[in-house]
A protein has these predicted regions:
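Residue position within the beta-strands of beta-propeller blades
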Residues: 108-109, 155, 215, 270, ...
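Loop/turn-rich, solvent-exposed surfaces of beta-rich toroidal or solenoidal domains
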Residues: 250-300, 317
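Surface loop/turn motifs at the tips and blade-to-blade linkers of beta-strand repeat domains
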Residues: 87-91, 134-139, 194-199, 249-254, ...
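Sequence/structural signature of beta-propeller modules
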Residues: 7-14, 22-87, 346-359
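Asp-box/WD-like beta-propeller blade repeats and closely related beta-sheet repeat scaffolds
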Residues: 175-210
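Beta-strand-rich domains and repeat architectures in extracellular enzymes and scaffolds
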Residues: 74-117
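Structural motif
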Residues: 115-122, 161-177, 221-233, 277-290, ...
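Structural signature of eukaryotic scaffold interfaces centered on beta-propeller domains
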Residues: 89-102, 144-149, 153-154, 160, ...
Length: 359
């Protein structure tokens, strides 16, 4: 009897250990490291019909103005594979956030809404239109912003309400980034990142343009123009970059719900969104004339210099303006937002001409 009890106890311990252990990535995603498929709508026609039912006005504007050959599934919505301390695990709870282009790679950031797993960067090779790796970061940051300056990949730091320290950003050297792409799942260690680079405003989203890292701050109040961006010059030698935070430029007058921005020539494009279920118009990409909004101090006040405002599907996040295309990332495809008015499970590629002909 005692022997049976001992064996039973050992069995319970073993089962508990197995349950607690990391679950390896699903076999079907062994090559990509995370899912890379459309979660809700398997083809553009299905997505179009859903958009027409939920947001008819947006459908009318977008119909015939999206590029199906440039649109990609948002990685990791079905399953994200994570590697922490050498152990692989999976999650279905990741929420997409940031978006940027680094050479021919498209980078999409995401965080685990339950804060159980570390944040990730999905890496998509736009030449082959395939997911090549999922990089697990050494933190659980919201990962709201990412930008590439040609040498380093910049990322937003801690932004949670619990964090009481100074705001900061970090970067990952591009050469280090490339070294992680040989594996479908890879783990970025803390020493591979730069030190914390402290700045003057909360880093909600990022944009790089002509030697300046623009850091946007989400204000979150409806129907106001309280969001803004600070532009910090990137200085220092390669491998030891820092930001000049003593002197910085300001872009003010953005929608308070700003989620992302991109500068293209003389124009600023701002992605703003609030409210996931309302049928009111709450999600936009707005084009501003930067040149005409410059003040006597060299800063910019874009309020009053709006040239085009286009309603887009709900819960838009960071954007890229690239040649003739606007790429839009969304968080509404995440399981956490399954009750959203419209679940967009793709990085939409939209014709830039929707915002007027000139960049």
């Amino acid at each position: 009897m005692k022997v049976r009890k001992a064996r039973h106890f050992i069995l319970i311990v073993l089962m508990t250990a197995i349950t607690a252990a990391s679950v390896p990535c699903t076999a079907s995603y062994a090559d990509t490291g995370s899912s890379f498929e459309y979660k809700y709508y398997k083809d553009p026609e299905m997505y179009g019909r859903a958009l027409q039912r939920s947001m008819a006005g947006v459908y009318d504007d977008f119909n015939g103005r999206t590029f199906d050959d440039k649109t990609i599934p948002i990685p990791g919505l079905v399953e994200t594979c994570i590697r922490t301390e050498g152990e692989d695990s999976t999650s279905k709870q990741y929420v997409p956030q940031g978006l940027c282009r680094a050479d021919h790679y498209l980078l999409v950031t995401a965080y685990d809404v339950r804060k159980k797993h570390n944040s990730v960067i999905y890496v998509v090779d736009m030449n082959g239109m395939e997911l090549v790796s999922t990089l697990t970061m050494p933190n659980k940051f919201h990962a709201g912003g990412i930008a590439f300056d040609g040498e380093n990949i910049w990322m937003t730091g801690e932004t949670s309400d619990k964090y009481k320290g100074d705001p900061f950003v970090q970067y990952l050297p591009y050469e280090t980034f490339l070294s992680h792409l040989d594996e479908p799942v890879s783990e970025v260690k803390e020493p591979e990142l730069s030190r914390y680079i402290y700045i003057k405003n909360k880093p909600s989203f990022l944009e790089y343009d002509e030697g300046v890292l623009w850091v946007g701050t989400y204000a979150g109040r409806k129907n106001t123009k309280d969001s803004y961006m600070y532009g910090y010059d990137i200085i220092g030698e390669p491998g030891n970059r820092r930001l000049n935070t003593l002197m910085y430029s300001i872009i003010a007058g953005l929608d308070s719900s700003a989620q992302g921005a991109d500068i293209a020539g003389d124009y600023l494009y701002v992605s703003s969104s609030y409210n996931s279920t309302s049928r009111l118009k709450t999600s936009f990409i707005t084009k501003y004339n930067l040149k005409s909004s410059q003040t006597g101090t060299g800063d910019y006040l874009v309020e009053g210099h709006e040239t085009n405002r286009v309603e887009v599907p709900k819960m838009n996040e960071e954007i890229i303006v690239d040649d003739s295309t606007v790429y839009i990332n969304f968080e509404s495809g995440a399981s956490y937002w399954r009750l959203a008015l419209m679940n967009t499970d793709r990085v939409l590629a939209v014709d830039l001409s929707l915002w007027g002909r000139r960049r």
